[in-house]
């Protein structure tokens, strides 16, 4: 009989250690399967005019990019969740059924992509469309990337990031949680996120309305009316005022950058913070500047569109 306590301890730990290793290996295999497509499909549709694209998914990423005229191409990647290991034959049959009969429909120049109503199965879509395409998407969870289309875009997600670039139509975006990024946008934009940052770069004219419950807002190249609201977070707005601007944040700093010759009606206030206006503008303010430096009301260079800024707790800087 082995009387060595350390030997008895090592021997008794072997089954537990083996079980732990097995669980780790099973978990690693599950992650590998979940991140690897279990199936794919591709379909091509011929169209003759401006396209209407509608995509609805329970979960999965959506990517839409512009391509040749007259053709819509759809590529799907099918993913299976952690139940793949415990129902392999049934899951394989479901994946095969989707590959053979994906949820795609064409009605004239309208392409519809419907939800896959199967538990723990999701599809990522990569879609190529003509530039003249209106896009409407709705996903429960998943990232969305939309690039290079000229039509209107109405994009919704329960959770996930949105990345937009080179769009020229009327854009409406909303995600429950996730970041929004828009670059080279030429047109009006309305929307926001419940939790996440919003970043927009405008290259054309259009009214912009952005909001976030928790996160920062950065909008550059503005040329129209602007409304920005954050529950908690900083807001930066840069551009040319061709209409009223209204900016509010409950907790955060606000920075506004306008052309040096801008004329506007100033209505600025902070409950707990400081106001700062660059010297060239300060010298031309007509009105009253409260001694407490908590609010400014008056005309800048004779007045113009209203610039209204309020922050509950944070500083305001106008340059």
Protein language model annotation of sequence segments:
Residues 1-319:
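Intrinsically disordered, low-complexity terminal regions
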């Amino acid at each position: 009989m082995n009387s060595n306590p350390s030997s008895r301890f090592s021997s008794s730990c072997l089954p537990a250690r083996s079980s732990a290793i097995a669980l780790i290996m099973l978990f690693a295999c599950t992650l590998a399967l979940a991140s690897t497509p279990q199936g794919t499909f591709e379909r091509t549709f011929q169209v003759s005019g401006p396209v209407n694209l509608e995509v609805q998914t329970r979960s999965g990423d959506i990517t839409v990019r512009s391509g040749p005229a007259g053709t819509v191409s759809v590529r799907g990647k099918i993913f299976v969740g952690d139940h793949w290991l415990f129902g392999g034959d049934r899951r394989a049959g479901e994946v095969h059924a989707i590959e053979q009969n994906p949820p795609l429909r064409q009605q004239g120049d309208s392409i519809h992509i419907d939800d896959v109503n199967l538990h723990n199965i999701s599809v990522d879509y990569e879609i190529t469309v003509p530039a003249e395409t209106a896009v409407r998407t709705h996903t429960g969870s998943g990232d969305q990337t939309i690039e290079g289309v000229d039509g209107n875009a109405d994009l919704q997600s329960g959770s996930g990031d949105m990345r937009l670039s080179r769009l020229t139509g009327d854009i409406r975006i909303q995600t429950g949680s996730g970041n929004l990024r828009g670059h080279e946008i030429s047109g009006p934009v309305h929307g926001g996120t419940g939790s996440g940052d919003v970043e927009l770069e405008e290259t054309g004219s259009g009214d912009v309305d952005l909001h976030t419950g928790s996160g920062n807002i950065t909008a550059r190249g503005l040329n129209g009316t602007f409304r920005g609201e954050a529950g908690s977070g900083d807001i930066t707005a840069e551009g040319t005022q061709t209409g009223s601007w209204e900016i509010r944040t409950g907790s955060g700093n606000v920075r506004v950058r306008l052309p040096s010759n801008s004329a506007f009606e100033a209505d600025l206030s902070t409950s707990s913070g400081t106001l700062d206006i660059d010297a060239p503008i300060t010298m031309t303010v007509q009105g009253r500047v409260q001694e407490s430096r908590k609010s400014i009301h008056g005309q800048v260079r004779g007045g113009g569109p209203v610039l209204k800024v309020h922050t509950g707790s944070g500083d305001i800087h106008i340059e």
